[in-house]
Amino acid sequence: MILIIDNYDSFSYNLVQSVGEINSDLIVLRSDEIDVSKLQNLNIKHIIISPGPGHPDEYTICKQVVKFFAPYTPILGICLGHQIIATCYNASIKKSSPVFHGRASKIYCLKDKLFLGIHAPFTAARYHSLVVDQDKRGLDLTTCLKTIAITREGVIMACKHRYYHFTYGIQFHPESMLTIQGTKLLKNFLSLSYG
């Protein structure tokens, strides 16, 4: 089963529809309705943390989900979800300059299972006012996170956990029409498994 955590974003419906077209075995829970201990009783194979408003530090339950499930369940954070994953592992967040609302950017990515079969650079939709701060560390965001995709200007568009190899964050929206290969990326993520 796929768990989609809905952070009250207007794009959540599009995300649920896109994922449901790939695999209809999914459950959608609002972030303020989640109890990590109850989630353990579900047969969760993948977790997707949706976009949403606000700052990632306001979503403590999502951080609890990431910390509990990341060692054995593939997790994909989208936009706010990406920032939640980054802050779970000590990356910092800063204001985006400029703010992006429905703009497409070229994304330059490293070779990774998440981007398998996706021709780089690819075009993706951006809707955000915050970004993960690169903090002059190159590809090493923190001791356990690395950058795997950026814009031409060097803004982080995707990160991945070094040890929990299927924990990813992406700043862009794969469910948007502006993201040319978004469905392929979601299929790639949903094909990942720890065993």
Swiss-Prot record:
Give the Enzyme Commission number. 4.1.3.27
One protein family per Pfam? GATase
- Reactions mediated catalytically: chorismate + L-glutamine = anthranilate + pyruvate + L-glutamate + H(+)
- Pathway terms, separated by semicolons: Amino-acid biosynthesis; L-tryptophan biosynthesis; L-tryptophan from chorismate: step 1/5
Q: Where is the active site?
A: C79 (nucleophile), H173, E175
Q: Which residues bind L-glutamine?
A: G52, P53, G54, Q83, S129, L130
Q: How is the subunit organization of this protein annotated in UniProt?
A: Tetramer of two components I and two components II.
Q: Under what name is this protein listed?
A: Anthranilate synthase component 2
Species source reads: Cyanidium caldarium (Red alga)
